[in-house]
């Protein structure tokens, strides 16, 4: 019997999608407010507030599949511990699916700020576009991505300015962003076998990939 864990379940959309397909899925999310929102939005789904780097979060051999999608893995500093935990939580023969990007080439600008949503604006830019400005009805939104390659760190800064009051709110996301090769080597060192790689270009996510990792029997 399948049992699926979505790490970094956020608003719960992936868990709900899997549940709608008849798959027993549950979510793990670090943010308690996100868990509350997901539970309100999808009361028929199961979500847990917890840390994927804490080994005691789940018992060994609990899941057949684990997913870690979008940029969740880049918010986790201790990726080695993350892989150890996923390996322990998976049953023998289980799968871990992780979402990674080419940090030098993926598109960090938002679709609504991209004048060529169906054709990557990056292809036609002389230099990589790493910032965007979007005008919404009542506020202006700015986003900027910076990468510090020597330290494997990235920062994504969002700034929102209210048109009426002039009030500014800023969210700064700190990402721990080594190369894909390094991350996959950590997974392999844990015992995972790389079974496949899916290029997400067909769904407009250029230089983003799903890696399928297998825990041997």
Identify the function of each model-found stretch.
Residues 2-8:
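Conserved class I S-adenosyl-L-methionine
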Residues 11-55:
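Class I SAM-dependent methyltransferase SAM/SAH-binding core
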Residues 57-65:
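A short acidic, Gly/Pro-enriched loop at the edge of an enzyme's catalytic core
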Residues 64-78:
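A short SAM/SAH-binding and catalytic strip from SAM-dependent methyltransferases
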Residues 80-92:
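A short glycine-rich, Lys/Arg-flanked "PGG" loop and its adjoining helix->strand segment in the class I
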Residues 100-181:
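SAM-dependent methyltransferase
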Residues 174-217:
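C-terminal lobe and adjacent flexible extensions of AdoMet/dcAdoMet transferase-like proteins
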């Amino acid at each position: 019997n399948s049992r699926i864990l979505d790490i970094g379940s956020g608003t719960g959309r992936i868990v709900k999608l899997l549940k709608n397909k008849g798959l027993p899925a549950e979510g793990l999310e670090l943010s308690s407010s996100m868990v509350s929102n997901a539970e309100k939005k999808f009361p028929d789904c199961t979500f847990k507030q917890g840390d994927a780097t804490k080994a005691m979060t789940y018992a060994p051999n609990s899941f057949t599949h684990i997913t870690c999608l979008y940029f969740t893995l880049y918010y986790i500093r201790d990726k080695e511990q993350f892989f150890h935990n996923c390996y322990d939580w998976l049953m023998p023969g289980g799968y871990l699916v992780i979402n990674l990007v080419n940090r030098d080439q993926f598109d960090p600008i938002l679709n609504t700020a991209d004048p060529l949503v169906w054709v990557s604006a990056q292809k036609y830019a002389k230099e990589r576009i790493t910032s965007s400005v979007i005008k919404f009805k009542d506020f202006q939104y700015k986003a900027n991505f910076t990468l510090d390659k020597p330290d494997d760190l990235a920062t994504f800064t969002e700034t929102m300015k209210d048109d009426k009051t002039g009030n500014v709110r800023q969210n700064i996301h700190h990402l721990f962003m080594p190369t894909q090769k390094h991350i996959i080597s950590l997974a392999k060192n844990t015992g995972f076998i790389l079974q496949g790689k899916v290029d997400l270009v067909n769904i407009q996510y250029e230089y983003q990939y799903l890696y399928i990792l297998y825990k041997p029997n």
